[in-house]
Amino acid sequence: GLEGRQPLLPAEGSALGAVNLAAHLTKGGRLDYKRLARTIHTAVHLLDNAIDVSEYADSRQSRLTRATRRIGIGMMGLAEVLRAKGVSYDSEKARKTAQQLAKVIDEQARLASQRLAGRRGPFPLFTESRQNNGAQRRNSAVTATAPNEVLAAICGVTPGISADCAVSAQACVKMQAAVQRYTEGNVYLPIPAKTREQMQELCTMGYLLGCKSIEADVCEPVEIPDFLKDCQPERETQEIAPEKPQSALRQEMPHFCPACGRALRKRQIVPVCEECGPLMCLQTVENMQ
């Protein structure tokens, strides 16, 4: 994940996932914490494996991601848990419930990462990190709540810690702050802010409560000033050289193999080098036609 749920180094990546809380509800509406702990340990193992088997954009991203081994386990289906308990989303009891769940996820994820480090070793940059004075961990970070709308839709639950009904923006910020206390990375929760002024107030509120980020769900469009509308980049006048006929281009451009330097010969459409074989270069094909 590169969307900012985990603070990352340049070109670094992380593996993110979410635990379906609703799947751990018993028939009586209670949470099965033992089963939840097993799920978290499995998730840590899964995401750590994902770091090794994933394909990356380049060698630098692959090297940095495997050096820190950041993962982010979050939650989804919180609204279903609160509804099963008969608790209103905008209540102190709901925030305490969410905070307790975040604490369990964080503690079990740390424990699972420590056990995994005992078998596989800590992340390569452990001795250079701020965690080198504590217990060895397989992953430099273990918890974060990312936007998991797709996963939630597959599981049939509400995404992340979102409510299943309309609630105030202040209630969302308070809920996010409650979960953020026991989350290493960021906690994603879209805030229904309608104006820029309201968004500024919510950002201040979130900062004072300990949130690491505040993201607006809906905000009024900002009018573009006239001086920006009329601003156009100056175009430099350049003289365009007359195009040369195709026959002249064919005579000027020698057709040699870029690998061994031998002359190319054309076989049907694909140019062929006697030493290296066919060359699938479209530009070379077009020039030889």
Each predicted region: which residue ranges?
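Long, C-terminal-biased catalytic regions of enzyme "large/alpha" subunits
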Residues: 1-289
